[in-house]
Amino acid sequence: QNECPWKPWC
């Protein structure tokens, strides 16, 4: 998925 789940805009 995303490599930065702590960034909702990633």
Swiss-Prot record:
Keyword Acetylation included in the entry's annotation: no
Positions bearing 4-carboxyglutamate: E3
Sites bearing Cysteine amide, chain numbering: C10
Tissue: Expressed by the venom duct.
Cellular component terms (Gene Ontology): extracellular region
Keywords, alphabetical: Amidation, D-amino acid, Disulfide bond, Gamma-carboxyglutamic acid, Ion channel impairing toxin, Neurotoxin, Secreted, Toxin
Localization: Secreted
The UniProt record lists the keyword Secreted: yes
Superkingdom of source: Eukaryota
Leader sequence segment: none
Disulfide topology: C4-C10
GO MF, any single term: ion channel regulator activity
Residues the record lists as D-tryptophan modifications: W6
InterPro entries assigned to the protein according to its UniProt record, in alphabetical order: Contryphan_CS
Main location: secreted
Notes concerning its domains: The cysteine framework is C-C.
Similarity comment text for this entry: Belongs to the O2 superfamily. Contryphan family.
Function: Its target is unknown, but this toxin may modulate voltage-activated calcium channels (Cav) or calcium-dependent potassium channels (KCa).
Protein name: Contryphan-Ar3
Species whose genome carries this gene: Conus araneosus (Cobweb cone)
